[in-house]
């Protein structure tokens, strides 16, 4: 919206608007994938608790649970990274758009940073992720990048 409203005064606005739409499509897709991954992980956790015995069935069940927990952590990581991308694009738009649109760009950056933070929390609490896990570092870096982009833009319009 910010870029589209600034087309008359900002040469790159059309390209930024196209990028924003692509990010919006990614977000919608990831929301669906995240819901599916979470449901699959919950189901696998329930099945692991219901299972009896060990042997090959137990090993197969454990492997399946691990695979589903991995996916349940991977999707929020992608969402955290997407949040950083959105916050960065919103910050760029806020710096270059019409002045009347800057507050909307700052709000978009802040919302994206909040989304990155929430997604990072989901990576942190996922049972398949432990301290020192590279995914945790990536999620935290994305959260920080999103937060910094939003704060930079918010500070510039206060």
What are these regions (language model features)?
Residues 1-128, 134-158:
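N-terminal glycine-/lysine-enriched basic segments
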């Amino acid at each position: 919206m910010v870029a589209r409203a600034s087309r008359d005064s900002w040469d790159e606005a059309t390209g930024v608007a196209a990028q924003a739409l692509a990010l919006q499509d990614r977000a919608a897709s990831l929301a669906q994938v995240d819901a599916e991954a979470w449901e699959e992980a919950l189901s696998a956790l329930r099945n692991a608790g219901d299972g009896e015995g060990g042997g090959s069935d137990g090993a197969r069940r454990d492997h399946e649970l691990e695979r589903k927990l991995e996916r349940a952590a991977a999707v929020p990581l992608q969402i955290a990274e997407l949040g950083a991308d959105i916050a960065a694009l919103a910050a760029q738009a806020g710096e270059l758009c019409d002045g009347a649109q800057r507050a909307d760009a700052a709000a978009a950056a802040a919302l994206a940073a909040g989304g990155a933070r929430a997604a990072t929390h989901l990576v942190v609490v996922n049972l398949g992720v432990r301290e020192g896990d590279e995914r945790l570092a990536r999620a935290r870096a994305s959260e920080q990048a999103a937060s910094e982009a939003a704060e930079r833009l918010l500070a510039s319009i206060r």
